[in-house]
Every structure is written in C-alpha cells, then in structure tokens.
Amino acid sequence: MSKSALDPVEFLKGALEIPSPSGKERLVAEYLAEGMQKLGLKGFVDEADNARGQVGEGPVQVVLLGHIDTVPGQIPVRLEGGRLFGRGAVDAKGPFVAMIFAAAGLSEEARKRLTVHLVGATEEEAPSSKGARFVAPRLKPHYAVIGEPSGWEGITLGYKGRLLVKARREKDHFHSAHHEPNAAEELISYFVAIKAWAEAMNVGQRPFDQVQYTLRDFRVHPAELRQVAEMFFDLRLPPRLPPEEAIRHLTAYAPPTIELEFFGREVPYQGPKDTPLTRAFRQAIRKAGGRPVFKLKTGTSDMNVLAPHWPVPMVAYGPGDSTLDHTPYEHVEVAEFLKGIEVLRGALEALAQTHAGEKEG
C-alpha cells in the first residue's frame, strides 16, 4: 500500500496550480513524479518530459496513460462548493492523478499479478502527441487505459480520427471588374464542395459515424502582382473513413490549381464492448454503486495514436464531465474524482483476479 498519506484532492490541486501548456510540461511532470515516489511508486521524468511511474512485478503489463499538458488559458485554481476548478481538472490532469492514486492503492496480491506503468503524457493537445509517441514503441502492454474524462460511470470505447488540411491558391492579380473568381473565392468554392460531400456522407448516420468539418482559419495575403489565399480546416473521421481514404476524396474535389497539404492523420478507433478490461471496469463501476455506460467520443485522444501500436484491449476512463474541456469554468466534482479513483483501483483489482495463477513467461 502507499507509504504516504498524500491527500488526492490537495495533490490534484497542486498539479492544477502548475501551468503546463503543450511543450511546457516539465515542472508539473517533476511534481507528479515526486508525488508518485512519496506514494511508494517508482517515479521519474523521461526524455519526452512524461511523468512516469511503475508499481507491481506481475507478468501482466498494464499501461495507464493520461496527458498532463493543457490548452492555454489559466483558470484561478480554487475549491468551491465541492468542486475543484482549474485548467486540467477534467482534461486531463484529474484523470491522470486518479490513475496515480488507484495504482498506489493496489493490494499486494494485485501487485504480484500486474505491473502497472503510469504515463503522464506530454503534448496531447498539440498535433505532435509527443509523449504518447515516445512510449508507443517502448512499452508492450497487455491492456491500456487512456486517462480522459468519461464520467465515473462511463467507459469510452472509441474516438474519431482526425485530418488537418491546408489549402492554398495563388494566381495572377487582376482587376476586380473582371468576371473571374479570385483566389479567395476559389478556396471558398472548394470548401463548399467539401461540406456538400461530408453532408452526403452523413445522411442517416449517428454522430459518431458522421464526417465533421471545421474551418479553422482563412487568410488572404495582399500582393501587387499575385493573389494568395490560404485556408485551414479539419475533419473528424468515423471508423469507416480512415485518413488516407479521406485524402483521396479531398484530392478528387480539388481543382489542380489548389495546393493541398495534410497533417495529423489520426486513425479512428473503436474497441469491442466485451473484453477482460471492459468486464473489469463494469464490475468496478457496479461495485462502486454505479451503472456502467459505454461511450463513443467525437473528438480525438492519445487512444488514436496508440491503438495502431498496441493491438490490445483498450478503453478511455476518467472522472469528469468532458463538456467542460477547454472552457473557462473547467472543474471536477470532488465526489466524482474520488469515485474515479475507486473505480480505477477496482478495475485493476478485478483484472488481477482475471489473471490469478498466471506465471511469468
């Protein structure tokens, strides 16, 4: 059991008080690693600035990975009316700290059957996903849990994929009286065509199976002799439309005069409902007094990055309401956070029982 009586709420509060926008996670990683050491875990910071921990010496390898970077924009950290406010309370320092305390509370029997690897990953909120990509080839789990808010009774089975697109049109400048579309108008026409294609793809589909599109930026660069227009948009992709297939469609709709660049290429993922891991979570949620609910998310997470590398049972789980992600009033209910720790610990104990009697090798 844990060597220190660290209070989980106060420990999370301390993590929230350390700003950690993507690319600047080192200080919070050191704080979390030190806390893991105080709780009796092996704790350290790796070369990607991930906060890492390990407990147990069993043959069954379990990865608990949540991200410790946040979007920009600090929120005054405060405990108010049973709610803990702060950037990252939900997305996703809260879920990762819950993972730390769940692992620290494991029984000796569970520690003999499992080796639990904790990863507080960096740059999840950036296109790089630096932390997840660093550990992907270095860890070989039998099970993986991604720390993202699902609500303490929720089990997330999948996330949509994502494709980032830059479109550019450059052409000779001409007088506005000419009956010819300018560079900006050509890009607008292209985006309208993409919207029409996506809407046709979405007919009769539930939200998780729809293609979502968002125009992120549109720029027109003034020039005397050449017109230059650029736009940036992203697509959220359902499992039936992997990034390379989406690129084929986007390229087909683009006139040859429009230059396209593609980034991200996160593969959509949806895991099965019935695995030893989902059964362990369902059991733990019921034991804590809840009713398990499976969820599919229209966003993306490190699950999209890791699923192609780790073909093992994988879910996302964490306390918190995901509708509060990135908002100026992000907070987690303290009772919800503590329930999340209870469920995570219970799921690990149940998983250990599933593998009772197994030997190394």
Curated annotation (Swiss-Prot):
Catalytic class of the enzyme: hydrolase
Annotated positions binding Zn(2+) 1: H67, D91, E148
Organism superkingdom: Bacteria
EC number in record: 3.5.1.130
Cofactor: Zn(2+); Co(2+)
Localization per Swiss-Prot or TrEMBL: Cytoplasm
Cofactor note (record): Binds 2 Zn(2+) or Co(2+) ions per subunit.
Effects seen without this gene: Knockout mutant shows significantly slow growth in minimal medium, which could be partially restored by the addition of lysine. Exogenous addition of ornithine has a negligible effect on the growth of the mutant, but growth is much improved by the simultaneous addition of lysine and ornithine.
Keyword Zinc (UniProt): yes
Catalyses which reaction(s): [amino-group carrier protein]-C-terminal-gamma-(L-lysyl)-L-glutamate + H2O = [amino-group carrier protein]-C-terminal-L-glutamate + L-lysine
Residues at which Zn(2+) 2 binds: D91, E125, H326
Pfam family, one: Peptidase_M20
An example molecular function term from Gene Ontology annotations: zinc ion binding
GO CC list: cytoplasm
One biological process term in Gene Ontology: lysine biosynthetic process via aminoadipic acid
Pathway(s) per entry: Amino-acid biosynthesis; L-lysine biosynthesis via AAA pathway; L-lysine from L-alpha-aminoadipate (Thermus route): step 5/5
Disulphide-bridged cysteine pairs: none
UniProtKB keywords: Amino-acid biosynthesis, Cobalt, Cytoplasm, Hydrolase, Lysine biosynthesis, Metal-binding, Zinc
Active site per the UniProt annotation: D69, E124
Complexes and interactors: Homotetramer and homooctamer.
Similarity-based family: Belongs to the peptidase M20A family. LysK subfamily.
Protein name as it appears in the record: [LysW]-lysine hydrolase
